[in-house]
Amino acid sequence: MTPHINAPEGAFADVVLMPGDPLRAKYIAETFLQDVVEVTNVRNMLGFTGTYKGRKISIMGHGMGIPSCSIYAKELITEYGVKKIIRVGSCGTVRMDVKVRDVIIGLGACTDSKVNRIRFKDNDFAAIADFDMAQAAVQAAKAKGKAVRVGNLFSADLFYTPDVEMFDVMEKYGILGVEMEAAGIYGVAAEYGAKALTICTVSDHIRTHEQTTAEERQLTFNDMIEIALDSVLIGDAQ
């Protein structure tokens, strides 16, 4: 047990899928897993363990922003022996060639947060996903006939940013999606010897203001979850 997770030892699988919303974690567990057990509920940050096609997998929410997700990721790795974390969530985009409902695999994550500089002695840390996990996710998407984009994300500290000019910089540098957690999770995984990947569905376009409906979000979200889950099985077979 930790101050933030009240699961007993051995309650989590070695692979954990992490959406931001704890209710989305519950949805994933109840929709895609079998033999589901709720293993933690401190602060209503729900966590579950079950099986997917016979493979033990856990699902747990991580909240919003790098500070929140970093706490949960660290404790899962160091206190519960988790080896792989897959963040599954939504993101915005600033690029006109990236569309709402696209699925993005975050090979790397830029950030305006200083957390990785703090842990890396004020030097720049290249926050990247585990290559094998990213490759497995691409293979899972291809097997489903789903197109995915692969590249850089931007993990922002501010949801309501006053610096709209930064969107132009992101577009120039080819940032595929804007979210709030990937760089932190990649940093934590690197620090504690684990592996991590982020998969996002584009829910809104920052330039055009196009947004998905609740029903559309659920449909595309399901594609992303199936890609993430199947990627675990592919990774096991490699």
UniProtKB/Swiss-Prot annotation:
GO terms for molecular function: purine-nucleoside phosphorylase activity. One of its GO terms (cellular component) is cytosol. Transmembrane segments: none annotated. It comes from Haemophilus influenzae (strain PittGG). Homohexamer; trimer of homodimers. Phosphate binds at G20, R24, R43, R87, V88, G89, S90. InterPro entries: DeoD-type, Nucleoside_phosphorylase_CS, Nucleoside_phosphorylase_d, Nucleoside_phosphorylase_sf. Keywords: Glycosyltransferase, Transferase. The record marks R217 as: Important for catalytic activity. The gene is deoD. The active site is at D204. This is Purine nucleoside phosphorylase DeoD-type. Gene3D superfamilies: Nucleoside phosphorylase domain. A purine D-ribonucleoside binds at H4, E179, M180, E181, S203, D204. It comes from the Bacteria. PANTHER family: PURINE NUCLEOSIDE PHOSPHORYLASE DEOD-TYPE, URIDINE PHOSPHORYLASE. It holds the Pfam family PNP_UDP_1. It catalyses: a purine D-ribonucleoside + phosphate = a purine nucleobase + alpha-D-ribose 1-phosphate; a purine 2'-deoxy-D-ribonucleoside + phosphate = a purine nucleobase + 2-deoxy-alpha-D-ribose 1-phosphate. GO terms for biological process: purine nucleoside catabolic process. Belongs to the PNP/UDP phosphorylase family. Catalyzes the reversible phosphorolytic breakdown of the N-glycosidic bond in the beta-(deoxy)ribonucleoside molecules, with the formation of the corresponding free purine bases and pentose-1-phosphate. The keyword Cytoplasm does not apply. Its EC number is 2.4.2.1.
